[in-house]
């Protein structure tokens, strides 16, 4: 288990096409990570979010930061920024 600073994103942020760094479609359960901290493809469990797959990256996602994909912009705003526990390959 590790503690990470989490933010939330929507698949269409920045005019993106919703395709992750690993080529999958982004959706709830997809998270962006720094692959130097959490390898892409890792199965994760985040108590405030649920089960997830590390399938994406992001320019601001460096070190112990994680970005959780949400289904709506409202969910992103409600989530905000917070520290979360991340269980890797649980």
Predicted regions: what they are:
Residues 1-90:
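Solvent-exposed, well-ordered loop and adjacent helix/strand elements within mature globular domains
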